[in-house]
């Protein structure tokens, strides 16, 4: 698997499309470190800011995150979720930073995990980076992604009795919601 990921190529165009040259994506340093150490992932290239983007299967998230923490990625800047559309997977995204003394610019990497809508579960990274606490709770509250092993996974923005996941693209807003008086 590691050899397959060494260089990713775009699929050849179909009969109706114009032929363009195949683009070869060379691994970044983080992806190369993970591949050299046997961690399965897919290298998706770099974003506009030059940050590596990796896709990880949910079963490999914790081992891969533990390896990245040991490699020096000591700060989870952001964990968020998003919906690719009705019938499409949900995504949990992690933006990790390697902060070190004397560095001109911190090293960064983004991980994404695609989850089926019917079973959006994955392990919590709270035990690696404590900054995941409220971020995972917000993602749970808005998208219904369950972070197994989180110490206090409950709604953080919506009322506890709210039904549904408001930021999913297939969410239907209720016509009426009765707020309980706090007194």
From Swiss-Prot:
Q: What does the entry list under GO cellular component?
A: plasma membrane-derived thylakoid membrane
Alphabetized Pfam families for the sequence? Complex1_30kDa
In Gene Ontology terms, what is a biological process of this protein? photosynthesis, light reaction
Supply one GO molecular-function term: quinone binding
Q: Which UniProt keywords apply?
A: Membrane, NAD, NADP, Plastoquinone, Quinone, Thylakoid, Translocase, Transport
Location of the protein in the cell: Cellular thylakoid membrane
In residue numbers, the region (Disordered) covers 1-21
Major location (coarse):
membrane
Q: What is its EC number?
A: 7.1.1.-
Catalyzed reactions per annotation: a plastoquinone + NADH + (n+1) H(+)(in) = a plastoquinol + NAD(+) + n H(+)(out); a plastoquinone + NADPH + (n+1) H(+)(in) = a plastoquinol + NADP(+) + n H(+)(out)
Q: Does the keyword Zinc-finger apply?
A: no
Q: How does it sit in the membrane?
A: Peripheral membrane protein
- Family, per the entry? Belongs to the complex I 30 kDa subunit family.
> Which NCBIfam families does the UniProt record give?
PRK12494.1
Q: What does this protein do?
A: NDH-1 shuttles electrons from an unknown electron donor, via FMN and iron-sulfur (Fe-S) centers, to quinones in the respiratory and/or the photosynthetic chain. The immediate electron acceptor for the enzyme in this species is believed to be plastoquinone. Couples the redox reaction to proton translocation, and thus conserves the redox energy in a proton gradient. Cyanobacterial NDH-1 also plays a role in inorganic carbon-concentration.
Tell me, how does this one assemble?
NDH-1 can be composed of about 15 different subunits; different subcomplexes with different compositions have been identified which probably have different functions.
Q: Know the name of this protein?
A: NAD(P)H-quinone oxidoreductase subunit J
Organism name:
Synechococcus sp. (strain JA-2-3B'a(2-13))
